[in-house]
């Protein structure tokens, strides 16, 4: 007859705890312990549905052009701020959107930022954007992308105001 050794195996919970401590020391964490929080079964959005009507916003944007100079504003933008996210300058938990106005003769100084940006030209003629020195003329309905951390500026050499919708992943990368 063979001899059976009675070795005590730690309970599963104790083994797991030891394992978690071991991987934690290596800067690792198990996804299976947090997946339910990261990818919930139902939405847990903290923003509210919202609608902005451009014909209602446009006069307010043009008034900003009268009251706030380009140098003072740097970029004259009315942010579309979600009513449930007041104070966040966000349209959703991960996106920023705003309507930017650039008047004839104005230039928004060259700048760069960690966020990627998109611009949808709403109205006006004569404006441009330049990315890394390459200038592109903006036309109604154009969709322009600016990759993150690229030097870019905007100007209006035309004789009418130009408006575009800015979209940035600002809340996501900040």
Regions found by a protein language model. Name each.
Residues 66-104:
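A short glycine-rich, His/Asp/Glu-containing loop-to-beta-strand
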Residues 100, 118-120, 145, 158-174:
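A short hydrophobic beta-strand segment most commonly corresponding to one strand
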Residues 103-140, 146-150:
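A short beta-strand-loop-beta hairpin characteristic of the jelly-roll/cupin
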Residues 88-91, 107-113, 156:
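Short histidine-centered beta-strand/loop micro-motifs
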Residues 1-82:
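Transition-metal
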Residues 97-100, 127-129, 155, 167:
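A structural feature that tracks compact, well-ordered secondary-structure segments
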Residues 68-71, 137, 154-157:
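A general structural signal for short secondary-structure junctions and capping/turn motifs
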């Amino acid at each position: 007859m063979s001899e059976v050794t009675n070795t005590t195996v730690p309970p599963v919970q104790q083994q797991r705890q030891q394992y978690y401590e071991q991987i934690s020391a290596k800067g690792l964490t198990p996804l299976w312990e947090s997946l339910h929080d990261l990818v919930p079964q139902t939405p847990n959005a903290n923003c509210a549905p919202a609608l902005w009507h451009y014909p209602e916003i446009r006069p307010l944007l043009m008034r900003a052009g009268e009251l706030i100079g380009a140098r003072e504003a740097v970029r004259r933008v009315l942010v579309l701020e979600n009513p449930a996210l007041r104070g966040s300058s966000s349209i959703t938990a991960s996106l920023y959107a705003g309507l930017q106005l650039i008047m004839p003769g104005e230039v928004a100084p060259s700048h760069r930022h960690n966020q990627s940006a998109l611009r949808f030209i709403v109205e006006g003629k004569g404006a441009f954007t330049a990315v890394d020195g390459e200038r592109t003329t903006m036309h109604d309905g154009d969709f322009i992308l600016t990759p993150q951390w690229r030097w870019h500026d905007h100007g209006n050499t035309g004789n009418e105001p130009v408006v575009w919708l800015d979209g940035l992943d600002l809340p996501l990368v900040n």
